[in-house]
Regions:
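Extended catalytic cores of very large enzyme megasubunits
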Residues: 1-127
């Protein structure tokens, strides 16, 4: 049985506005469709067809367990293309001009970037 009920209006708003995928002409997914997309694109390819994932799916639907919400949000082509989209944040020292390229790419994937501009790193930019 699929549970599409989220206990509070706030939870329903967050799930719909942050994690549900938008489809032209249909609108946004409901909670069960978001969970199904995650299971189809992230979990099942990793565990294989021989493993029954219905208990895990029901636990996610019932909010008993919660996977990476970034992975739930980007499950599908975006996450398959580059797993950077599955992370909340990243870090890099700014010690090479390429760090700026890397930071931009990571940000475009929707992942936050922390960085260090400590003297020992920044001095390497001059070389």
């Amino acid at each position: 049985m699929r549970n599409n009920y989220l206990p509070t209006d706030y939870q329903a708003f967050i799930a719909k506005s942050r994690y549900a995928k938008y489809f032209d002409g249909k609108g946004r997914e409901d909670w069960s469709e978001t969970v199904s997309r995650y299971m189809t694109n992230v979990v099942r390819p990793k565990v294989g067809a021989e493993y029954n994932t219905s208990q895990l799916e029901q636990a996610i639907l019932g909010l008993e367990v919660m996977p990476s919400m970034r992975a739930m949000m980007t499950a599908g082509p975006a996450l398959a293309r580059d797993n950077t989209a599955g992370y909340n944040c990243s870090y890099l020292p700014v010690d090479d001009p390429k760090a700026f390229d890397e930071a931009m790419f990571i940000l475009l994937c929707g992942t936050g970037v922390g960085f260090s501009v400590e003297r020992q790193f920044v001095q390497r930019l001059r070389s």
